[in-house]
A protein has these predicted regions:
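Noncatalytic, solvent-exposed loop/strand surfaces
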Residues: 5-202
Length: 202
């Protein structure tokens, strides 16, 4: 990539247009024989979540299991595994941790490695949904919680076999999520304060 270009942001799942298309100009059309040069590396815990990039920061979720705990050899097993889910904010220039936030989150799902959803960046907020249905809105500057909810308790739903795995969608002033449950398959929140605006589908 040309050093004179500023890389486009990738603020959520499938990019800024949600279509998986990279529109930046001047990118490589093929990698060097020995692969692209590594700029930095950063340790990240377990999980399936992809990174989001915005305003010089990289956001990614992972999971840290409690000391002495371990995931079952059979990925379909649904035993309870104690641990925390975590959101990391890294400096895109050097990979150093800017801030991190974690919360207690025992897993009782199949394929229990970690979170599934990519963080979503909108203005000065970052939204995350954990595998057990914990939805958080945090400040991008320091990770401070702005609002949160728990799908299991708020909508009386059970965590799906594979966990909650749908990244939320921003539409105008709404944050739209797939919560599941009777009448709450899709739920829209005010993206700023977390108040429910509507719910739909069974």
């Amino acid at each position: 990539i040309s050093s004179t270009l500023k890389a486009d942001d990738w603020p959520g799942w499938f990019g800024p247009e949600r279509d998986g298309v990279w529109r930046e100009e001047g990118i490589l059309d093929k990698f060097p024989q020995k692969g692209p040069k590594t700029i930095w590396k950063a340790p990240v815990g377990r999980g399936y979540a992809g990174p989001a990039v915005a305003d010089g920061k990289v956001y990614i979720m992972d999971r840290q299991i409690d000391k002495g705990a371990k995931s079952p050899e059979n990925p379909f097993s649904k035993i309870t595994i104690p641990g925390n889910e975590r959101l990391l904010c890294l400096d895109a220039k050097n990979g150093e941790i800017v801030w991190e936030k974690s919360y207690n989150c025992p897993y009782s799902i199949s394929y229990s490695a970690g979170p599934r959803t990519t963080p979503l960046i909108d203005e000065n907020r970052v939204y995350t949904i954990g595998a057990e249905g914990n939805l958080y809105c945090r400040s991008t500057s320091d990770g401070k919680e702005i609002w949160s909810t728990d799908f299991n308790t708020a909508f009386n739903v059970k965590t799906p076999t594979w966990g909650f795995s749908s990244t939320p969608l921003i539409y105008e002033n709404l944050l739209i999520c797939l919560a599941g449950g009777e009448g709450t398959v899709a739920v829209a929140f005010n993206k700023s304060n977390g108040k429910e605006v509507w719910r739909s589908l069974s």
